[in-house]
């Protein structure tokens, strides 16, 4: 009986201990589960944050494709909107029909003798071989059908280098906004619609890819080791891209003007801002910038590897001299101010761009946007790309003046802006290539404005 009583008295005690222990275990398991969920959520957010730019760019590209192809969902759609589009369609067709090679003699130009093709555009080959690749999966597709999609695809790919440029110049928000502003620019859309296989889309793709490549190479310079892999690989890739650009369009030298101008001004500014003008300090400036000079030398070598076998040794000086002759040559062959201006005036590339005010209004197509959206013109003007660009430069100047920040970004974008602004007053064609400047500067200004407003909250 005594044992039974002892057992009975011990049982509640054991139960209390067991319940307490069980509750502790449950609480520990709950804490562990909560911690695991928090860790998993943190990992998921980090993964999402890492892949968010990729997702955003894919969505931007899909929407860009849809916008440029929307006209073909209707019954009466336009095709081959200008004579250049017809010319490239014809060359691509000749390459396809001639087993992958463009005939050296063009029977349809300068009739009845024809025209000898010296260096055909790489764009015609890219289009023809891309068509051959897609025909593997869609054997019944014809070339004219493929060229509905091809220019829209090339224009949409511009979102990638635009994002990289904005990201390297400021941050990822600026990169995403730059992609949006660039591919949905009215100026760019009008020159890269589906069924209009002119070279504007691929020219813009090569131009921005060249600039993005240079910025990546510059931001990854190893100043301590001259022969570091990064000092060779990135500039070499950039040189190859610019070389392919040269095989595509004669105005490739715009990329060289930006790069060479930036390097020269960077070297001079480093020398001037320290206010020490002796040989010893000049040697220090050279030492600090030697990796940049070396990377440019690698870029030039890679460029020559691509271009000299095609154009010959005489082309070696072209990247450094083309810019000096092109604007004067454009004015010379146009003759707009003469009594009988010649046929070149009828070509959009050759028409005068007007003054700076005309260029600023044209680049934003403010009246067209106001009419299409119903938004008052004054509000459109206040949010115009030109004013946002000016706001961006004001911020960059302020950041450099107060905190010595963003000087490289300020220098690079200033060269880009001034260079293309002057070119746009000479020929209306170059207004299109001022579009990336507005897109990127507007993106940087709005991204910085967003950061300021969020911090205030």
Q: How would you name each of these model-derived features?
A:
Residues 67-169, 173-181, 185-206:
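Active-site lumenal/periplasmic loops and adjacent helix-entry segments of GT-C-fold
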Residues 60-65, 136, 149-168, 173-222, ...:
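Membrane-embedded helix bundles of polyisoprenyl
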Residues 44-85, 90, 97, 103, ...:
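Transmembrane signal-anchor helices characteristic of membrane glycosylation enzymes that use polyprenol
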Residues 224-229, 274-292, 377-415, 452, ...:
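Membrane-interface helix-loop-helix junctions at transmembrane boundaries of multi-pass membrane enzymes
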Residues 1-72, 83, 176, 232, ...:
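Start-transfer (signal-anchor) and selected internal transmembrane alpha helices
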Residues 328-399, 409:
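Alpha-helical transmembrane segments at the extracellular/periplasmic loop-to-helix junctions
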Residues 254, 419, 426-457:
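Hydrophobic/aromatic-rich transmembrane helices and adjacent perimembrane loops
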Residues 219-226, 232, 242, 255-304, ...:
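Perimembrane helix-loop-helix junctions
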């Amino acid at each position: 009986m005594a044992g039974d009583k002892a057992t009975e008295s011990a049982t509640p005690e054991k139960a209390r201990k067991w319940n307490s222990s069980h509750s502790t275990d449950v609480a520990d398991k709950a804490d562990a589960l909560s911690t695991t969920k928090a860790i998993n959520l943190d990992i998921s957010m980090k993964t999402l944050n890492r892949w968010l730019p990729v997702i955003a760019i894919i969505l931007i590209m899909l929407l860009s494709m849809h916008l440029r192809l929307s006209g073909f969902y209707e019954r009466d759609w336009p095709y081959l909107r200008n004579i250049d589009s017809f010319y490239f369609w014809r060359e691509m067709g000749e390459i396809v029909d001639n087993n992958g090679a463009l005939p050296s003699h063009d029977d349809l130009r300068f009739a009845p003798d024809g025209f000898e093709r010296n260096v055909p555009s790489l764009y015609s080959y890219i289009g023809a071989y891309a068509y051959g690749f897609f025909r593997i999966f869609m054997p019944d597709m014809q070339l004219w059908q493929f060229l509905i999609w091809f220019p829209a695809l090339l224009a949409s790919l511009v979102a990638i280098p635009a994002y990289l440029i904005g990201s390297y110049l400021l941050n990822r928000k600026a990169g995403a906004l730059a992609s949006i502003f660039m591919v949905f620019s009215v100026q760019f859309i009008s020159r890269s619609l589906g069924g209009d296989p002119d070279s504007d889309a691929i020219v813009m793709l090569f131009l921005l890819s060249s600039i993005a490549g240079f910025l990546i190479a510059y931001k990854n310079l190893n100043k301590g080791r001259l022969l570091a892999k990064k000092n060779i690989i990135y500039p070499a890739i950039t040189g190859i891209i610019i070389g392919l650009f040269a095989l595509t369009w004669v105005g490739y030298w715009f990329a060289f003007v930006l790069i060479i101008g930036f390097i020269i001004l960077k070297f001079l500014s480093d020398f001037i801002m320290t206010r020490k003008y002796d040989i010893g300090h000049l040697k220090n400036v050279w030492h600090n910038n030697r990796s940049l000079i070396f990377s440019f030398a690698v870029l030039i070598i890679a460029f020559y590897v691509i271009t000299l076998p095609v154009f010959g040794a005489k082309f070696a000086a072209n990247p450094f001299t083309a810019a000096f002759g092109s604007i004067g040559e454009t004015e010379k062959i146009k003759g707009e101010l003469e009594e009988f201006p010649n046929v070149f005036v009828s070509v959009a590339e050759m028409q005068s761009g007007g003054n700076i005010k005309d260029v600023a209004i044209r680049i934003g197509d403010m009246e067209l946007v106001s009419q299409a959206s119903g938004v008052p013109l004054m509000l459109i003007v206040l949010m115009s790309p030109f004013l946002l660009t000016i706001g961006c430069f004001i911020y960059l100047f302020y950041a450099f003046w107060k905190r010595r920040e963003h000087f490289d970004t300020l220098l690079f974008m200033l060269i880009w802006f001034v260079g293309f602004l002057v070119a746009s007053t000479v020929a209306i064609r170059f207004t299109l290539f001022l579009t990336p400047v507005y897109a990127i500067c507007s993106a940087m200004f709005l991204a910085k404005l967003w950061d300021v407003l969020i911090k205030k909250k």
